[in-house]
């Protein structure tokens, strides 16, 4: 987000809870994208000036991020960035492999026609952009596929947890898509999951979604992509 956009945060929201949430999202994104590095000190006054807000929503956002383990509060100063470590990433993918399977299984039983059509559209567009080599678009479509599946699971808690996990490892996911042959492979895996969901085969959908995560973990390990965390 550019400075001009950040300076208008106050104009985009009308109450302190929305403002705090917006500030939280901006800072969190900068941590997860690597713009704010591990160990970097985040000063309340500097952040407030950068975002065009008072120190109060910045302080509240940093406290919320401390609860997520993304920063460590430094009294009377601000916070130190912790971010997502390589060990965190391993834990996240281990949990995702189980929860994505559960999510796909629920989706096989609960998905509606609109959601199914959306997944099919995403798979079709992904094939198109694989051929074009449009990696930014592939990353966006990968996000969309998983978000629609989370919604189709009908589980509010699964959607919340998996959406956070998906976002936490965005840097390494993007790097994984750049690795040779992975962009084509991940969509073939998506299409297999989609077919199982379409057939309402819960067990098959669970196994394929679980395997999809394990294949991603293997690719990350083979390419040494954990260094991107």
Outline where the language-model segments fall.
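Short linear motifs at protein or domain termini
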Residues: 1-105, 109, 217, 221-229
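Conserved amphipathic alpha-helical segments that form helical-bundle/coiled-coil interaction surfaces
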Residues: 92, 109-174, 188-196, 204, ...
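Conserved G/P- and acidic residue-centered "switch" motifs that form tight phosphate/ATP-binding loops
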Residues: 201
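Alpha-helix N-cap/N′ positions at the starts of helices
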Residues: 76, 99, 121, 185-188
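Mobile beta-alpha loop/short-helix "lid" or hinge segments that flank ligand
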Residues: 67, 71-72, 165-167, 182-184
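Short helix-capping and inter-helix turn/linker motifs at the boundaries of alpha-helical repeat units
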Residues: 18, 116-117, 181-184
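Short alpha-helical transmembrane interface motifs in multi-pass membrane proteins
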Residues: 85-86, 172-176
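Juxtamembrane/interface motifs at transmembrane-helix termini
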Residues: 59-60, 110-113, 137-140, 158-160, ...
């Amino acid at each position: 987000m550019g400075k001009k956009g950040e300076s208008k945060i106050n104009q985009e929201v009308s109450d302190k809870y929305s403002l705090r949430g917006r500030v939280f999202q901006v800072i969190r994104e900068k941590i997860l994208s690597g713009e704010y590095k591990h160990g970097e000190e985040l000063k309340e006054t500097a952040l407030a000036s950068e975002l065009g807000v008072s120190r109060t929503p910045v302080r509240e956002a940093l406290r919320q991020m401390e609860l997520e383990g993304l920063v460590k509060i430094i009294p009377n100063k601000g916070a130190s960035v912790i971010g997502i470590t390589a060990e965190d990433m391993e834990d996240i993918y281990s949990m995702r492999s189980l929860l994505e399977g559960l999510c796909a299984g629920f989706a096989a039983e609960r998905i509606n026609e609109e959601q199914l059509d959306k997944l099919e559209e995403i798979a079709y567009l992904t094939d198109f952009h694989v051929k074009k080599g449009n990696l930014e678009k592939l990353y966006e479509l990968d996000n969309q596929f998983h978000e629609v599946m989370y919604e189709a699971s009908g589980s509010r808690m699964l959607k919340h947890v998996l959406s956070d996990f998906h976002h936490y490892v965005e840097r390494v996911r993007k790097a994984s898509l750049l690795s040779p042959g992975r962009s084509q492979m991940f969509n073939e895996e998506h299409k297999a999951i989609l077919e199982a969901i379409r057939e309402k085969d819960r067990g098959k959908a669970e196994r394929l979604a679980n395997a999809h995560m394990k294949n991603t973990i293997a690719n990350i390990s083979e390419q040494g992509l954990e260094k991107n965390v």
